[in-house]
Amino acid sequence: MSMKELAEHIIYVAHKNKKSITNLQLQKILYFTLRYSVPEIGLRAAIKTYDEPFLTTRYGPLIKSQYKRFEGYGSSPIIGDATQHEEYNALNKMILELIDKDVFALVASSKLNDFWKRHEDEIIKEGLMIQYPIEAVLKLDANNQERLVNYIFAEEKTD
């Protein structure tokens, strides 16, 4: 499980359903799919997937490696084969709903995150790309928030 595999799966779902997807759409769908993934795939899988941090940009969060990977398409749809990753099948409905949303509505919504808003001046005026901590990405209920804190604390103990 990784951000690369989630990106591949999102593209696969789009193509399988005869929908086009641009790089900007992919970035926003990556963000929202991971943000709301815990009820569908579980906290552990969401944490494992987040192996590369989102970075702040004027257009909301992006995963740099995946942005660079598809940068050559510009604003054109991403074409070519894509790989299904079955561990993300539970996210397919959400992915399809997000693909049908206006990309600039997704951009605007992604900037409503408290983390982005807190750093807005640095992002807009200085062009800083700041890493999102996982707790700023995942939308968690109180129980999962506590589990995330315990998980992070356990990881720090082993370092």
Where are these regions (language model features)?
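Domain-edge interaction signal
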Residues: M1-D159
